[in-house]
Amino acid sequence: MRPCWPASAKIRCVSARELDAAGITDPVTRESNERCRRLNADHGKTYYLATLLLPPAKRPYVHALYGFARYADEIVDDLASSLSEQQKADWLGRWGDSVLADIAVGHSDDPIGRALVDTVNRWQIPVEHFEAFLHSMRMDLTVTEYATFDDLYTYVYGSAAVIGLQMVPILEPLDDAAYPAAVDLGVAFQLANFTRDVGEDLDRGRVYLPLEDLQRFGLTRAHLETRQVTDAVRD
């Protein structure tokens, strides 16, 4: 076999082998999957490296899920965007509704949606997981803080828990105990992200730490906005 080099060519060869292993033969769908893979590699480096631990036949489908989530998240969170919150909401609504409609009919011409629809069809992933995700993305455009953990959980379920639920059919676990475990893992990752990204979230005008939990430590949103790491913040 001819060696694949330089590096960019080698990556394309690896991607082609993964698509072959996954049984994805349609050229347009392969291009859509490759677009999703590049999104994963460029924007989710740790997630991308994690996919390399999976069998090659699984990787394109995971990239498709990432591509969908990343595209929606970029509409909402691109700090360089000149769009208003309402314009973002309109764009997300149109794109999300279009992808959901494509899932319903089993075909998409969207550059990201085509790989997603193929993945959903092959693995019979429930559409409500994607509806919940889009709902949480819309919340990011209107909700800037959460009074209680119960309030926050609605957002966390849609933005993180359902990602695990989307993954389970692809991973083909031995029993259904994987489903609640996937939810718990997604929630845990998201809560860790909230703790890590307080400053970044403030830049976007949001606080994900529940206000009732801040109050238990004598803190308010205003304390976080000072960007000072006090003993109370550490606690």
Map each language-model feature to its residues.
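Acidic catalytic motifs of isoprenoid enzymes
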Residues: C4-D235
